[in-house]
Amino acid sequence: MKKGTVLNSEISSVISRLGHTDTLVVCDAGLPIPNSAARIDMALTQGVPSFMQVVDVVTREMQVEAAILATEIKQQNPQLHETLLTHLEQLQQYQGNTIKISYTTHEQFKKLTADSQAVIRSGECSPYANVILCAGVTF
């Protein structure tokens, strides 16, 4: 049995295949997932697992260089926005690198997901609970 933090075989596999600047999306239950991206559906019911639970587990195993958020999260979901920023700050310290955070419109965000290696759907049912994680290198 795998001893690492990610037991889900699809998530573990996609993270292990990421190259520098490849992207991985963690999204809420409502984000449309393009056919061009692999869909990893973790949603069991509303709120399970939460967006932050999925982000936490994924970022324990993935080296993150940048994160892209929809601008709308600032106004429409400020509490989750702050929680995510705090998590990314702590991740920077753990990884020993700076994580660039950028924002785009929700419409543009949805277009960017088409280029991701995979989209991991959480059970989160709060607005704009989505992030595009850009892979860094460990050296």
Curated annotation (Swiss-Prot):
Active-site residues annotated for this sequence: 20
Alphabetical list of Pfam families matching this protein: RbsD_FucU (PF05025)
Catalytic activity: beta-D-ribopyranose = beta-D-ribofuranose
Key words of the record: Carbohydrate metabolism, Cytoplasm, Isomerase
Record flagged with keyword Heme: no
Top-level EC class: isomerase
Subunit structure: Homodecamer.
NCBIfam families, per the entry: PRK11797.1
Entry-linked PANTHER family: D-RIBOSE PYRANASE
Protein name: D-ribose pyranase
Gene assigned in the entry: rbsD
